């Protein structure tokens, strides 16, 4: 207890010295932004910040995340390759420029340039963009894209006039959108400050100034909560829930998260992972029930699959390979590895709930079945760059897809990496299964909902049967709200902090 108190005192001293009176609402989150360019990163952390400064053509408001109008008042799929969006009139960017179809066309054309965008998956699906008038946009896609509209809440629209001649360095100082909040200041490692857009098309938000403080260290987030240095804190440490519940000034809010935590793998020829028996053995070696009980303190739900129930492609009845160390040893021996082999368990140490501890546990389980396991955990800023460079054979990572469609996830996570086509962008182990690739490509053109669900469920089943990955659990999102300001906060399924929704 004394050590905890000392740690909290140190953490309090580390908090930014910003007076709460200067800001109407302070939110502490567990991840910083990497850029103010809304297309530079597709991580939920970066998109969360961007959702305050920018709007998409559509939105997914809390609590249910149902696709709804935003900068587009209506939309329709005209045929298999054509989508029409009818834009909202009277909307202005923060600099006073009028929003119109030219901005939409410019945005999606800019997203095709890898210099500015990592959203190539959607951008490269577009063959052409027509703007017959200022408030109509017609997209022609290269092939049928069933989930095209489903992603339009996270493809944020930028102001053409102020963006076209600026690089990312300049853009980071003054992002220009139509969102509910105007950008004020980004002090890296400390805070992002924003001011209410009084002319917002949905009406001015409640809080006039908002500050989002990224704090990756659990103890420091807890200290902010204990010291009333924040109004809302996300990423509440599960190990400290009992202590937080005893704080009279704090209300805990939790909800099942859509994010699945899983172990990604390689199956490269010449490596042990190329043998499915090795992949099965590793799955049998991991005691997920113990991870949930002892590491997650019950704040997680075991899963056999990565997509969650609301996602098209989720399949009832899929079962994970049971924890069975003896079967694991037997499979390793059959594969020619009775004496084990060296294996590195990689992962971030500041991205997911107890990520480092989970990696440590997995390494321990693998050692128990005879593998020579070592740990390689590091800050997410380094780890994800390594994932993008396909440097790891076995790693912990998390995922959920805002499109609610396994097809898009499969293209990014399971398809053999093909950077030119935007395939396998987050397939960190470069897992490759030609049959799975074929199924993914074929499913991408299926528009009928029932037929598409059947095809995506087949992809899901194969990924589990071939042990393309080892799903562990769905996280539980836990937020803390400090009482006193009558803050009404409803967590979103995507974990975004959308300040306009806080009442």
Where on the chain are the PLM-derived regions?
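Aromatic- and charge-enriched surface segment that lines or borders ligand/interaction sites
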Residues: 73-116, 132, 138, 221-224, ...
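Structural transition elements
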Residues: 269, 302-334, 352-357
């Amino acid at each position: 207890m004394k050590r905890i108190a000392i740690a909290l005192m140190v953490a309090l001293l580390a908090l930014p010295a910003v007076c709460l009176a200067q800001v109407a609402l302070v939110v502490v989150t567990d991840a910083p932004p990497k850029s103010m360019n809304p297309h530079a990163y597709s991580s939920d952390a970066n998109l969360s910040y961007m959702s305050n400064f920018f709007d998409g053509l559509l939105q997914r408001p809390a609590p249910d995340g149902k696709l709804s109008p935003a900068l587009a008042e209506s939309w329709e799929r005209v045929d298999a390759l054509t989508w029409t969006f009818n834009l909202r009139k009277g909307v202005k960017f923060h600099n006073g420029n009028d929003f119109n179809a030219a901005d939409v066309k410019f945005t999606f054309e800019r997203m095709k340039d890898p210099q500015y965008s990592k959203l190539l998956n959607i951008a490269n699906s577009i063959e052409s963009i027509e703007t017959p008038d200022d408030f109509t946009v017609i997209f022609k896609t290269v092939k049928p894209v069933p989930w095209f509209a489903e992603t339009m809440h996270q493809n944020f629209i930028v102001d053409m006039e102020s963006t076209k001649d600026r690089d990312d360095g300049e853009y980071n100082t003054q992002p220009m959108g139509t969102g509910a909040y105007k950008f004020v200041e980004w002090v890296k490692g400390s805070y992002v400050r924003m001011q209410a857009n009084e002319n917002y098309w949905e009406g001015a938000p409640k809080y006039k100034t908002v500050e989002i403080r990224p704090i990756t260290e659990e103890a420091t987030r807890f200290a902010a909560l204990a010291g009333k240095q924040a109004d809302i804190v996300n990423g509440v440490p599960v190990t400290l829930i009992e202590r937080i519940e005893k704080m009279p000034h704090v209300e805990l809010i939790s909800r099942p998260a859509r994010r699945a935590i899983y172990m990604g793998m390689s199956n490269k020829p010449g490596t042990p992972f190329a043998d499915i028996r090795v992949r099965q053995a590793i799955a049998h070696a991991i005691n997920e029930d113990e991870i949930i009980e002892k590491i997650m303190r019950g704040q997680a739900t075991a899963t056999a699959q990565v997509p969650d129930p609301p996602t098209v492609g989720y399949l009832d009845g899929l079962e994970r390979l049971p924890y069975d160390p003896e079967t694991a040893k037997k499979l390793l021996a059959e594969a020619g590895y009775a004496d084990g082999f060296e294996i590195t368990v990689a992962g971030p140490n500041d991205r997911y709930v107890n990520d480092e501890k989970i990696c440590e546990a997995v390494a321990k389980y693998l050692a128990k079945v005879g593998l020579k396991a070592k740990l390689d955990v590091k800050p997410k800023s380094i780890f994800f760059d390594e994932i993008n460079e396909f440097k790891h054979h076995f790693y912990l990572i998390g995922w959920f897809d805002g499109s609610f469609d396994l097809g898009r996830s499969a293209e990014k996570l399971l398809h053999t990496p093909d950077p030119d086509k935007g395939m396998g962008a987050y397939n960190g182990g470069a897992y490759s299964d030609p049959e799975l690739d074929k199924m993914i490509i074929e499913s991408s053109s299926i528009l009928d909902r029932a037929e598409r669900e059947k095809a995506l469920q087949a992809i899901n089943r194969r990924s589990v049967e071939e042990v393309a990955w080892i799903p562990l659990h769905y996280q539980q999102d836990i937020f803390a709200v400090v009482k006193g300001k009558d803050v009404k906060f409803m967590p979103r399924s995507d974990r975004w902090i959308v300040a306009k929704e806080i009442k």
